[in-house]
């Protein structure tokens, strides 16, 4: 299992016009882990940033850890390889360091990323992520992908995959939403016990759901005490829980700040206070898919 660099640059909701510069700056600042996905519709611009830095000799391809994700409309076994090669083409790369199943749910294949019925609910593809996984394993043996992982899997789904008869490639990470308002303790404990790392997306929360983690008085107090920003506290919190963290930003000052998290340590009391903020408050609920048999959030964790 390869070591995934602890802090990566998230590229979700990074507009194509901004993301190339963000990637170039991030590489200059020492980022080596880039989290991408077909669904973000900006992979070719991410790839341009990576290619320019490789061409300039700032980094070699093997110094980078590039992640992408298989979208839900491509869960049919016959569609997996094309989805992967399309991503590689967009990123202008020969291989991915890590390829994730973006969600455990398969959707009807076709033009639309999220095909909905007349009631506004997703149209499933009647595939099983266990079958999808077999096609992803083939990608490893064909040299297109070095490692596999999952995203948004609950513990039962991850267990089904880990216990699958004839499993050839183990998932190395479960990428999940994680921040102090949704600290995911039970799921993280489960993953770590089963030797699967956890990657935290939306570690800074976000403006959805009507809350701003950055304004939380406890987080601000701890930030002030350490002479750091609230974002740096939120990232450091996850690092000290042995998580991989992928904060998204296209703002130069924030891209810089988000990786300057290795020169201080939160105390045990800080960590306890941050853990006590849990409200089980999830931002990425994907409500149009609640009808799907593999919807991951109907159970506690």
Swiss-Prot record:
Residues annotated for substrate binding in this entry: 102
Residue sites binding NADP(+) per the record: 35, 175, 246-258
E.C. number: 1.1.1.263
Listed GO MF terms: 1,5-anhydro-D-fructose reductase activity
GO cellular component, one term: cytoplasm
Keywords from the UniProt entry: Cytoplasm, NADP, Oxidoreductase
Regulation: Inhibited by p-chloromercuribenzoic acid and alkyliodines.
Transmembrane segments: none
Residues at the site labelled Lowers pKa of active site Tyr: 69
Catalytic activity: 1,5-anhydro-D-glucitol + NADP(+) = 1,5-anhydro-D-fructose + NADPH + H(+)
Active-site feature positions: 40 (proton donor)
InterPro entries listed in its UniProt record: AKR (IPR020471), Aldo/ket_reductase_CS (IPR018170), NADP_OxRdtase_dom (IPR023210), NADP_OxRdtase_dom_sf (IPR036812)
Subunit annotation: Monomer.
Function as written in the Swiss-Prot or TrEMBL entry: Catalyzes the NADPH-dependent reduction of 1,5-anhydro-D-fructose (AF) to 1,5-anhydro-D-glucitol.
Family in the record: Belongs to the aldo/keto reductase family.
Protein name: 1,5-anhydro-D-fructose reductase
Annotated source species: Mus musculus (Mouse)
Lineage: Eukaryota, Metazoa, Chordata, Craniata, Vertebrata
Gene that specifies this protein: Akr1e2
């Amino acid at each position: 299992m390869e070591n995934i660099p602890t802090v990566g640059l998230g590229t979700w909701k990074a507009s194509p016009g901004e993301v190339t510069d963000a990637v170039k700056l991030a590489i200059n600042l020492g980022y080596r882990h880039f989290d991408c996905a077909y669904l973000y519709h900006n992979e070719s611009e991410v790839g341009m940033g990576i290619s320019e830095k490789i061409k300039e000799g700032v980094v070699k391809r093997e110094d980078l850890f590039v992640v992408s994700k298989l979208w839900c409309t491509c869960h049919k076994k016959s569609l997996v390889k094309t989805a992967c090669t399309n991503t590689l083409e967009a990123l202008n790369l020969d291989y991915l360091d890590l390829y994730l199943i973006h969600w455990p749910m398969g959707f009807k294949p076709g033009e639309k990323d999220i095909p909905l019925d007349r009631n506004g609910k997703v149209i499933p593809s009647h595939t099983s992520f266990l079958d999808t996984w077999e096609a992803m394993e083939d990608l490893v043996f064909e040299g297109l992908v070095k490692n596999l992982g999952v995203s948004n899997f609950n513990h039962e789904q991850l267990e089904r995959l880990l216990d699958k008869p004839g499993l050839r490639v183990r998932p190395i990470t479960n990428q999940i939403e994680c921040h102090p308002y949704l600290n995911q303790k039970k799921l993280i404990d489960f993953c770590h016990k089963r030797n699967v790392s956890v990657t935290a997306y939306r570690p800074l929360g976000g403006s959805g759901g009507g809350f701003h983690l950055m304004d939380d008085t406890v987080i601000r107090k701890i930030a002030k005490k350490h002479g750091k920003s609230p974002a740096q506290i939120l990232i450091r919190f996850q690092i000290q829980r042995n998580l991989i963290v992928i904060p998204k930003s296209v703002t130069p000052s924030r891209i810089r700040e988000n990786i300057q998290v290795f020169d201080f340590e939160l105390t045990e009391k800080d960590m306890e206070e941050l853990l006590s903020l849990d409200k089980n408050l999830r931002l990425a609920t994907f409500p149009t898919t609640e009808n799907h048999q593999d919807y991951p959030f109907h159970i506690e964790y």
